Curated annotation (Swiss-Prot):
The protein's name: Bromodomain-containing protein DDB_G0280777
Transmembrane domains' residue ranges: none
Region (Disordered): 44-83, 200-281, 429-654, 753-781, 855-886, 949-993, 1055-1079, 1190-1386, 1453-1477, 1679-1823
Acidic residues bias: start-end ranges: 631-643
Biased composition (Basic and acidic residues): 65-77, 225-250, 601-614, 1716-1737, 1744-1755
One GO process term, biological-process aspect: regulation of transcription by RNA polymerase II
Location of the Bromo domain: 306-413
Residue ranges of coiled coil: none
Residue ranges, compositional bias (Basic residues): 210-224, 1813-1823
Organism of origin: Dictyostelium discoideum (Social amoeba)
GO molecular function annotations of the record: structural molecule activity
Length: 1823
């Protein structure tokens, strides 16, 4: 069911009426009819609700509709959904705030009720408070106990943690000591091990040396024996040769017999061959069978056991699976490239990847699972170390996943270790090889040779070599593998040894790189000599042996390497040949050499084959040769013998080698044993060290954690203190207070004052009787009060009908706004201070009036007098409140003010919307909170007080204008009387008392608050509207404090910027009001929008704020007021912004902007819907208390009823004697003030003549006079106090108030009366100063005389006015004595004394009122006459001044025409800033002045640059001249060498004087340069000084200009705007002429410099002219004609100059004003001048060429002799070198063409012809 209220239905029916026709608003009767219809239709509905608020009854009925009604309502809702939902405020009659009479009666009734209610409430409150306190104490005890327990627990925890920390710290120290001990033992073991090894090596080297010495001796013996054998053999050979010859003879004889036998034997030989062929074929079959046998291939060859093969297969599968894990394995497959990661190999010293692990696995380098796992872990650790950046987290994740998978795969691999087994095998094989070599027979040793079984580590390496040796072979010793530790990585293989081919000649040993000893060299020579005879024998049997060289580990010591090289060299020297062959398969792949049996088989087969071949060869030799069996036997015997000898030698050598090998093997075995022992010990120590280090780290981590926990806990001392304090606070005995409740009575100020009277008991009795009577009459008063209420309500309805209709219309218009929160446009009372500015005076008036009324109720005799006093008091209160009205207010405020003016009542409920307050604040206000208002108003910030005090100190005279205007309304007859006079007086008061706020205060307050708020939140970005939106968030906290100061003088709505709407309605005949003082000015219409944007709205302002915050963050100083720092930075910006403004410097006067508009019934001015930001931002939702937006609805100007009634006779507590004294004293004061005013006026006249000294004197006079006034007032008040004898306390209070009010009133009257005169005189002087800055002193004196005359006349009028005003002031002295102290003092004397005083005062007041009314009418008539006279005088003065201006301008024009400036027109160099002639646009003129200043600075800079360029050019020319001179000297020296010695002497004699002249010229040039530099420096200094002076003058002039602008009146604006355009043109001419004069002052300085340079030139050139007079006579005769022709040309040019100078100078000044026709004529003239100049130039060139030709001819004629020719070629007097050496004068600027020409003519006459020719060379070309 839809729950619909009665108000909604009313709105539905009235919606169309209000939405379409706002004028057809319902009346009261129509509203009542609508209510009745709903009551009749809904009788059944009993859900009516009523509520009362202050006497008004509003009936709101909620009813449940029937089904039929629901359908109708639904249909209506559907229709109305399309339309806008508009909520209408009900036309409800609010409760009245009672009048003053009713309030006094009703207050007595309410006091008792309120006291009873208060007592009951307080009684219950105290009970509740006691219960609350009881429970609070219990809760506090619980909290204290809980805290105590917590602190106890924390202490226990702290003690436990400290004990743990001490124990673990001891353990950690123990572990550290153990570590140090183990480390020391490690170092000792290492040192001992190294010492033992060194000793063994020394013993081994000694044994080897002894053994070698023995071998050397044996060799010497053998050599002797061999020599003897050789001799024997030679002899035997000789015998054999003889025998052979004999045999040959015999053989020839038997040759024939042999042929026969051969045929027989041929058959035998064929059979033998067949047998031999079969044997060879059988051998081949065996070979083929051996090759066909193929062993099954294995992945890893060289492994000894099957367990090792299984381990390698498992590791291979792990690697393959990791590689196949492609999602995460791709970064670890290959090496890292340096291009991808350049710093990788600098950070990671041991790189590893999967490809490198596969290589190591193929090389059989992994001997355990642990080594393989280390390499895998190394890959992942390298990845984590390098990829520490966040960009490398991806690779770390890949590494983590690969590590997980590797752990899963490695679980399947068996944990085996084969490192120790390999070492044992190596040792056993070495021993077996030694034993087998000793047991082998001699024959087997020749055929098979010795073989050394390879080591396991040798097999793992890919580099294996096979060597074939001829008779003897040497086995390489195994490396010292045991020296290396087990934990080291596997050995890397060394490069394979070079392979040597088999040859009959002996080969060099393999170790060719190592050097041979002399003993070894002898052995090699012997072996070569022995092998030569044997090499020829055909039956040299060769034995092939395979020797496998073991790889050398990189970690072997250098000593082991040296020992092996020595052994190899010794073995190679003894062996005849040791060659190696690589056994290869058919495919070319190296076969493995693991099985020693296979090698032996091949070697045996090779030996058998060679034997068979030798046998076949022998058989063939036997057939060919015819030797006998005997010879063959002999040869065999010889061979056998040789073989036996060789075998013996070999056996000896083998024995020697074996002995050496035994020594080495023994040494190696000892070292191995030592290494094993050392390794075992070190392993144990390393394990122990690791365990201890882990323990230490564990202890450290635990200690750190414990320490953190201790740090988090509070200290033990604090805990103990807290525990002790808590124990003291604990109390178990807590009980309720059962004592009696005593409530003190509510005591008003009246009761307190009465109780304080101890002397007068009668008065207390009377008060008690009165209170009893009041209690009895309460019931009767209540009944009468309700009857009167109905009458007043009817009056209220009739009077407020129009106002209520207006208010409804306004709210309906406001409801049409497009946003939800309409209250955002209305400011709350908390932030508005327009009507809440209730001073203490008003509050005290109210209290005193109530007190007087209560006294009058008690006294029956004085009722009539009391009624009169009450009427007067009410009238005075109303008039005082009218003074508090703002001149500008919002629409709602005006509506409420209209209600208040009707004197019917007030709506307290509307204060939230209307920002207004009742006349008399009730004891219990409904909506207004005085606490919030008082706190905000009475406690301003210190910075604001400083600023306000500073502004008051500067404007003491203007801030004391608070005038008290009291309005009297005694009936409709009084209101109609004198309305026209009142309006005129109001206009005058508005002129005298403008509502003004200083613009400086507004800027300072806003800039301070914003700067402080930005310190906390610096969020400013952007410009214009966006910045303002951000300021709303920042400045919201600041509006509540500072907005109250502005809202005293302004309303919600801003002032209209467009003056066209207001100025149209003002009458033309009415004179404009006088201007405000120069020091005060209004802020603009919208405060935040205008001020904040001017300061910080631009982007530059925001940047400056940011810079300010950055600077402040760097600086450590803290300032209370940051504005004083910002003012320095923003000073230039404010000046520019002020200059840009056009009209009034951003200041607006209320009287000009808001004038009374006669618009008919509704005096409304429509303004555009623009707030601070131009629109309502929809994303901002403000609360109702804070509002930055302005009500867009129309503004209504209130009618200003500011009539000046100077009759305030309410509270004159002084006697007649006191008043008479005051009259006399005030008359004296007025006389003093008049004298002061005369001084002020005279001083102002002098100040306008720009005399600073006079201004200072005038200020001093003003201050002294003001002090005199104050002193006089104080004396007068003291006299008043002496006359008062009855009431001491009252007189003391009155004396204080009189001191203040007399001073204020006297000063205000004197100042206000003299404002018009001073301002008028100042304005007249400003006209003279602004327009006639160049006038004579005589005119100023005349003006001053006129002004003095006016001042005297005005002062006479002021005296009369002051005398009249003093009478008013005497009556007004005691109007404001409303403090509560007099009430307290009167209670001491009793009620009777107070009543007598009041009666006397009332009688005295009635008499004074009649007198004052008569005086007031007379004063008004006098004022009107004075104003008329003043206006007439001002008009006359203006006419006189205008005529004087015209005369002065004519005189100046005549003077300017007579002047003939020597210089042509130049651009404006400098212009004195003058006061603006067109005052409607002062800011444009300021901009022009700034532009002129910039132009001046630019021109000065250009001049400086030109001077610098000239100086540089001169320097360059001098350098060129010096270079040319050097070249000439070199040429002269070369020619002198060729000339005859006699000629040389002649030339030297001639050149000596010339050289002297050149030296003198150089000295003079240097001096000139120095002078020029000094002059330039001086000029620069002068220019800088001038610039500084100009800047200072400009600043002073700008300040004066601002002051003058502020002092100008709107009347001057109109007058000057009406001036003719011709006069304005003349004023512009004056400015331009002054600029030309300044330029003329600058040019003579430049001309003097040029003349000095030109005077120096002829002096330099006269010296060489005197030396050669004979040679130059002919040249002078020829060139005399040229200067005459040149003199004619400059004569033509000066004739043109005066023509140009005679032209009127107005051409320069009136260029901007001249017509276009005149401009065209000037252009044509300029073109003609340029054409003439070009013709002159051509004519000069022709003459130059002719003069050059003639000079050449003359020189050729003069050079007759060879000597003279040589001298002329080399002499510096020739024209070319002189022209180069001569410094050219500085080029004249284009701005001064005429002056340079005139100067050149004068110099050419004095210069001789040759010098003139030299000058014409280069400078004329530059022209």
């Amino acid at each position: 069911m839809d729950h619909i209220t009665m108000e909604e239905k009313i709105n539905k029916k009235t919606k169309h009426i209000f939405s379409n026709n706002y004028d057809n608003i319902l009346s009261d009767k129509q509203v009542q009819c609508i209510y009745k219809e709903f009551f009749n239709n809904n009788k059944d509905n009993n859900n009516n609700k009523r509520f009362n608020e202050n006497g008004n009854q509003i009936n709101q009925i909620d009813f449940n509709s029937n089904k039929e009604e629901e359908k109708e309502e639904k249909e209506e809702k559907e229709k109305e959904e399309d339309e806008d939902n508009i909520t209408i405020l009900d036309d409800v009659y609010y409760s009245l705030e009672y009048d003053f009479e009713d309030y006094i009666k009703y207050s007595k009734i309410l006091t008792e009720k309120i006291e009873k209610e208060r007592i009951t409430q307080l009684f219950e409150q105290e009970k509740q408070n006691r219960l609350i306190r009881y429970h609070q104490r219990i809760q506090q005890q619980k909290v204290i106990k809980e805290q105590l327990n917590v602190n106890m627990e924390l202490l226990e925890k702290r003690k436990l943690l400290e004990t743990e920390l001490s124990l673990k710290s001891n353990q950690l120290n123990q572990c550290q000591t153990q570590l140090q001990q183990f480390q020391s033992t490690m170092t000792l073991l290492q040192s001992q091990h190294q010492q033992t090894i060194n000793k063994l090596k020394q013993t081994q080297s000694e044994q080897l040396q002894k053994r070698r010495n023995q071998q050397h001796q044996n060799l010497l013996k053998k050599q002797k024996i061999q020599k003897e054998k050789e001799e024997r053999e030679q002899k035997e050979k000789e015998q054999k040769e003889k025998e052979q010859k004999e045999k040959e003879e015999q053989q020839q004889q038997l040759f024939l017999l042999q042929q026969q036998q051969q045929q027989e034997e041929e058959s035998k030989t064929t059979n033998k061959k067949k047998r031999n062929s079969r044997t060879t074929s059988i051998n081949r079959v065996f070979r083929s069978l051996l090759t066909d046998v193929k062993v099954p291939a294995k992945k890893f060859n060289g492994l000894k056991s099957e367990a090792q093969e299984e381990m390698y297969d498992q590791l291979d599968t792990v690697l393959n699976q990791l590689k196949d894990y492609s999602d995460h394995s791709f970064p670890f497959l290959t090496k890292v490239r340096p291009s991808e990661a350049p710093n990788y190999y600098e950070i990671i010293k041991k790189p590893m990847d999967l490809s490198l692990m596969t290589k190591k696995l193929k090389k059989l380098e992994y001997q355990s699972k642990f080594e393989f796992q280390l390499d895998l872990n190394l890959i992942f650790t390298n990845c984590r170390i390098y990829n520490t950046d966040p960009s490398g987290k991806v690779y770390v994740e890949h590494a983590n996943k690969m590590e997980k998978k590797s752990k899963d795969l490695m679980k399947n691999v068996k944990d085996l270790d084969f490192s120790m087994d390999i070492l044992k095998d190596i040792v056993d094989e070495n021993k077996n090889n030694n034993n087998s070599n000793n047991s082998v027979d001699n024959n087997n040793s020749l055929k098979k040779g010795r073989t050394s079984t390879p080591n396991k580590k040798q097999k793992t390496s890919n580099s294996t070599t096979t060597t074939t040796t001829t008779t003897t072979t040497t086995t390489a010793t195994t490396p010292n593998l045991l020296n290396t530790p087990l934990s080291s990585p596997p050995y890397t293989p060394c490069s394979p040894s070079t392979i040597s081919t088999v040859s009959s000649t002996p080969t060099t040993p393999q170790s060719a790189d190592c050097p041979l000893s002399p003993f070894q060299q002898q052995q090699q020579q012997q072996t070569q000599a022995q092998q030569q005879p044997t090499s020829n024998s055909p039956r040299n049997t060769t034995t092939t042996t395979t020797t496998i060289t073991s790889p050398i580990s990189p970690r072997e010591t250098n000593k082991d390497v040296i020992m092996e090289e020595e052994e190899e060299s010794s073995s190679s020297s003894l062996s005849s040949s040791s060659l190696a062959l690589n056994s290869q398969n058919e495919n070319g792949v190296n076969k493995s050499i693991e099985d020693s049996t296979g090698v032996k088989m091949e070697s045996e087969e090779s030996t058998n084959v060679k034997k068979e071949e030798n046998q076949s060869g022998d058989c063939e030799n036997q057939t060919t040769t015819t030797t006998t069996k005997e010879e063959g036997e002999e040869q065999q015997e010889q061979e056998d013998e040789e073989q036996q000898q060789q075998q013996q030698q070999q056996e000896e050598q083998t024995l020697e080698i074996e002995n050496e090998e035994d020594i080495i093997n023994n040494f190696n075995s000892e070292i191995e044993s030592l290494n094993n022992d050392f390794s075992e010990k070190t392993l144990q120590l390393s394990i122990q060290i690791k365990e201890i280090s882990e323990k230490t780290e564990h202890f450290k981590i635990n200690n750190s954690k414990i320490q953190q926990n201790l740090d988090e806990l509070p200290l033990a001392d604090k805990l103990n203190l807290d525990i002790n304090n808590a124990k003291e606070l604990v109390d178990d005995n807590i009980e309720l207070d059962d004592s009696e409740i005593i409530i003190p009575p509510y005591l008003n100020n009246n009761n307190n004052n009465c109780n304080n009277n101890n002397n007068n008991n009668d008065n207390n009795n009377n008060n008690n009787i009165d209170n009893d009577n009041d209690n009895n009459n309460n019931n009767s008063l209540e009944n009468s009060f309700e009857i009167e209420k109905s009458k007043k309500i009817n009056k209220f309805k009739e009077l407020t009908k129009e106002n209520r209709v207006r208010k409804l219309k306004y709210f309906l218009d406001q409801q049409s706004l497009p946003f939800n929160k309409r209250e955002a446009f209305i400011r709350t009372p908390y932030f508005m201070n327009t009507f809440y500015n209730l001073d203490l005076q008003q509050q005290n008036q109210k209290q005193q009036q109530i007190f007087n009324q209560e006294i009058n109720d008690n006294d029956d005799d004085n009722n009539n007098n009391n009624n009169n006093n009450n009427n007067n008091n009410n009238n005075n209160n109303n008039n005082n409140n009218n003074n508090n009205k703002p001149k500008v207010m919002s629409a709602i405020q005006k509506m409420d003010q209209d209600f208040m003016d009707l004197k019917v009542g007030f709506f307290p409920e509307l204060t939230h919307l209307s920002n207004s307050i009742p006349i008399i604040t009730p004891n219990y206000p409904i909506t207004c909170k005085n606490s919030s208002i008082d706190n905000s108003v009475t406690t301003p910030s210190k910075s604001l007080l400083r600023l306000l005090n500073s502004s008051k100190s500067n404007n003491n005279s203007n801030n004391k204008k608070e005038k008290q205007c009291n309005y009297n309304r005694e009936g409709e007859d009084d209101e109609g009387r004198g309305e026209e006079q009142k309006e005129k007086e109001e206009e005058k008061e508005d002129e005298d008392f403008p509502n003004i706020i200083t613009n400086d205060i507004a800027y300072i307050l806003l800039s301070k608050s914003i700067a402080k708020s930005i310190e906390s939140e610096s969020c400013l970005h952007g410009t214009t509207q966006e910045t303002m939106l951000i300021f709303t968030d920042i400045v919201s906290s600041f509006i509540g404090k500072i907005g109250k100061l502005f809202n005293k003088y302004y309303s919600n709505n801003g002032l209209p910027n467009n003056k066209s709407t207001t100025t149209q309605t003002t009458p033309t005949t009415q004179l404009q009001p006088p201007p405000p003082p120069p020091s005060l000015s209004l802020p603009p219409s919208l405060l935040l929008n205008s001020i904040v944007t001017d300061i910080f709205g631009d982007s530059l302002g925001i940047l400056l704020l940011k810079d300010y915050m950055i600077k402040k963050s760097k600086n450590q100083q803290i300032y209370d007021d940051p504005l004083f720092e910002l003012e320095v930075e923003f000073e230039n910006d404010h000046l520019q912004s002020d200059n840009i403004l056009q009209n009034n410097n951003g200041d607006i006067d209320i009287n000009e902007s808001m004038e009374i508009d006669i618009l008919g019934e509704d005096d409304i001015i429509d303004i555009d819907d623009t707030g601070l930001f131009g629109h309502y931002p929809r994303y901002i939702e403000e609360p109702a208390e804070i509002t930055l937006f302005i009500d867009p609805k129309p503004i209504q100007k209130p009618t200003t009823n500011t009539t000046t009634n100077n009759n305030n006779n309410n509270n004159n507590n002084n006697n007649n004697n006191n008043n008479n004294n005051n009259n006399n004293n005030n008359n004296n004061n007025n006389n003093n003030n008049n004298n002061n005013n005369n001084n002020n006026n005279n001083n102002n006249n002098n100040s306008n003549s720009n005399n600073n000294n006079n201004n200072n004197n005038s200020n001093s006079n003003n201050n002294n006079n003001n002090n005199n006034n104050n002193n006089n007032n104080n004396n007068n008040n003291n006299n008043n106090n002496n006359n008062n004898n009855n009431n001491n306390n009252n007189n003391n209070n009155n004396s204080i108030n009189n001191n203040n009010h007399n001073n204020n009133n006297n000063n205000n009257n004197n100042i206000n009366n003299n404002n018009n005169n001073n301002n008028n005189n100042n304005n007249n002087n400003n006209n003279n100063n602004n327009i006639n800055n160049n006038n004579n002193n005589n005119i100023n004196n005349n003006n001053n005389n006129i002004n003095n005359y006016n001042n005297n006349y005005n002062n006479n009028n002021n005296n009369n006015n002051n005398n009249n005003n003093n009478n008013n002031n005497n009556n007004n002295n005691n109007n404001n004595n409303n403090y509560p102290k007099p009430i307290q003092a009167s209670t001491q004397t009793g009620n009777l004394g107070i009543q007598q005083q009041l009666q006397q005062q009332q009688l005295h007041q009635l008499q004074q009122q009649q007198q004052l009314q008569q005086q007031y009418q007379i004063q008004q008539q006098q004022l009107h006459l004075q104003q008329q006279q003043q206006q007439q005088q001002q008009l006359k003065l203006q006419q006189i001044q205008f005529q004087q201006m015209q005369q002065q301008q004519q005189q100046q024009q005549l003077q300017q025409q007579t002047r003939q400036p020597s210089q042509p027109q130049t651009p404006q160099m400098q212009s004195q800033p003058q006061t603006p002639q067109i005052l409607s646009q002062p800011q444009q003129q300021l901009q022009q002045l700034q532009q002129q200043q910039l132009q001046q600075q630019q021109q000065l800079q250009q001049q400086q640059l030109q001077q610098q360029q000239l100086f540089q050019q001169q320097q360059q020319q001098q350098q060129q001249q010096q270079q040319q001179q050097q070249q000439q000297q070199q040429q002269q020296q070369q020619q002198q060498q060729l000339l005859h010695p006699q000629q040389m002497q002649i030339q030297q004699n001639l050149q000596q004087p010339l050289q002297q002249i050149q030296q003198q010229q150089q000295i003079q040039q240097q001096q000139q340069q120095q002078l020029q530099q000094q002059q330039q420096q001086q000029q620069q200094q002068q220019q800088q000084q001038q610039q500084q002076q100009q800047q200072q003058q400009q600043q002073q002039q700008q300040q004066q200009h601002h002051q003058q602008l502020q002092q100008l009146q709107p009347q001057q604006q109109q007058q000057l705007q009406q001036l003719q355009p011709q006069q304005l043109q003349q004023l512009q001419q004056l400015q331009q002429l002054q600029q030309l004069q300044q330029l003329q002052q600058l040019q003579p300085q430049q001309l003097q410099q040029l003349q000095q340079l030109q005077q120096l030139q002829p002096q330099q050139l006269q010296q060489p002219q005197q030396l050669q007079p004979q040679q130059l006579q002919q040249q002078q005769l020829q060139q005399q004609q040229q200067p005459q022709q040149q003199q004619q040309q400059p004569q033509q040019q000066p004739q043109q100059q005066p023509q140009q100078q005679q032209q009127p100078q107005y051409q320069t000044t009136f260029q901007s004003i001249a017509s276009p026709k005149e401009k065209d004529k000037e252009r044509e003239k300029e073109k003609e001048r340029e054409r003439e100049k070009e013709k002159d130039r051509k004519f000069k060139k022709v003459k130059k060429t002719e003069s050059k030709k003639e000079s050449k001819k003359s020189l050729n004629d003069s050079s007759n002799s060879d000597i003279n020719t040589s001298v002329e070629q080399h002499s510096p007097l020739s024209p070319q070198p002189i022209s180069s050496s001569k410094p050219t004068p500085p080029p004249v600027s284009s701005k001064q063409p005429q002056t340079t020409q005139s100067n050149t003519t004068t110099t050419q006459d004095s210069i001789p012809p040759i010098e003139q020719k030299k000058k014409r060379g280069r400078p004329q070309k530059k022209q």
